[in-house]
């Protein structure tokens, strides 16, 4: 096994810069991977990931403990059938909505960003784990999802994307691809602790695995319409900079709901959208 460990303990600077990144199994067929913990990896060029053998170290890049992957310069689109693994944690339970945007796409086809396809969501209980868990997500047609020690069961009933062309929600179930940059709705699993969202022992950690998205990602949006979008990259996004770089954007909406109400019926729930715009607004003029 060949591995490259990048942690803030060993790097002094919490940024590692790489011209190009190519990760593939060893000549003997053993897994090779990059494990990044609490650091930023900056790749100036392209990333090519060749899939490792199935097993505990199937991924080619593991981002853990707020590690981020950034690409810039003249980087073209990524390629290969290898997997980047990045965690997202939420305490939204089987009655509460998540709005997700995948930082990865299918690890198949030619170069470039791909739709996230059938949802590849693993479950993990250890934020610094390297190994993959034995149970990839399962789907159920029931309204309520569930989780066990090593697997998630996600309800297909709440999987939707919002299309600008029709100005309406479209059911995707567990199979329809969502293009890079677009979002989708999903309810969580089990019942979580609503008293402490940041230290909830029942919170779920979702492991997004696939080819890392990169480059410019266009979201088509017609006048007077809305769309469900999100951060499509395996790194943080400065929303103010995004706002000023996109002159057609007027404002952002964030969903929140009363998570102490455990019901799937719309009439029972309390929720709504909060509006956010940066100070000294200019691009969309809505907030001025």
Q: In which residue ranges do the predicted regions lie?
A:
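A short, polar beta-strand/turn micro-motif
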Residues: 42-137, 167-251
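Bacterial Sec-dependent N-terminal signal peptides
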Residues: 1-25
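Short, surface-exposed beta-strand/turn "edge" patches of beta-sheet domains
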Residues: 160-176, 274-281, 286-288
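C-terminal trimerization/auto-chaperone modules of long, extracellular attachment fibers and adhesins
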Residues: 20-56
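Generic short N-terminal amphipathic or hydrophobic helices
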Residues: 14-17, 153, 266, 276
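Charged, glycine/proline-rich intrinsically disordered loops and linkers
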Residues: 119-149, 268-269, 275-287
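Beta-sheet-dominated scaffold domains
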Residues: 224-288
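Intrinsically disordered, low-complexity linker/loop segments enriched in Gly/Pro
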Residues: 137-170
